[in-house]
Amino acid sequence: MSRIGKKPIDIPSGVEVTVGADVVSVKGPKGTITTPVHPMVSFTVADNAVEVKRSGDSRQERAQHGLHRSLLANCIEGVSKGFSKTLEVVGVGYKVNVQGKNIVLNVGFSHPVNYELPAGIEASAEGNTKLTISGVDKQLVGEVAAQLRRVRPPEPYKGKGIKYIDEQIRRKAGKSGK
């Protein structure tokens, strides 16, 4: 039995879970999100909790059981609290601006890099060096943050680039002079 899958998911007040044939829809104060459901897994909603059941006991069914329980728990947390990732731009002359649904990155290229935010994602800049990405979909928030970091990943010699706020950059020693 999946240890993660057998735990019921508590539904906080203000959150509504609707189970369809092949999709589960979660609606809350921060928005709405839907997640597809594998046919091997079924959901039952009762007493402000959701239970995840699987049809058999094969290896794949056990894996899908825990996966779908975690995905639904992330959906419920996303529509009630939301998710966010904070990026920091490190380097002389490096800065970030948010203009509506666009992020403009000046990170040492000859031109500014424009990144258009997908639907459901919001960004806010704190000063010129910190950028917070937030939304209800945990996977999409992480993907957008990773794509922005990929524009100029931190380099190991001076630590310049775009990094997560809690990321530690492993530094290398420079060349040894004669």
Curated annotation (Swiss-Prot):
> Sorted alphabetically, which keywords does the UniProt record give?
Ribonucleoprotein, Ribosomal protein, RNA-binding, rRNA-binding
One Pfam family in the UniProt entry: Ribosomal_L6
Signal peptide positions are none
| PROSITE patterns according to UniProt | RIBOSOMAL_L6_1
Q: Which GO terms describe its cellular component?
A: cytosolic large ribosomal subunit
**Molecular function as annotated in GO:** rRNA binding; structural constituent of ribosome
Any one biological process term the GO annotation gives: cytoplasmic translation
Q: Give the HAMAP family listed for this entry.
A: Ribosomal_uL6_B
Q: What does this protein do?
A: This protein binds to the 23S rRNA, and is important in its secondary structure. It is located near the subunit interface in the base of the L7/L12 stalk, and near the tRNA binding site of the peptidyltransferase center.
Q: Which family does it belong to?
A: Belongs to the universal ribosomal protein uL6 family.
Q: How does it assemble?
A: Part of the 50S ribosomal subunit.
**NCBIfam families recorded:** L6_bact (TIGR03654)
Would you tell me the protein name for this molecule? Answer: Large ribosomal subunit protein uL6
> What's the name of its gene?
rplF
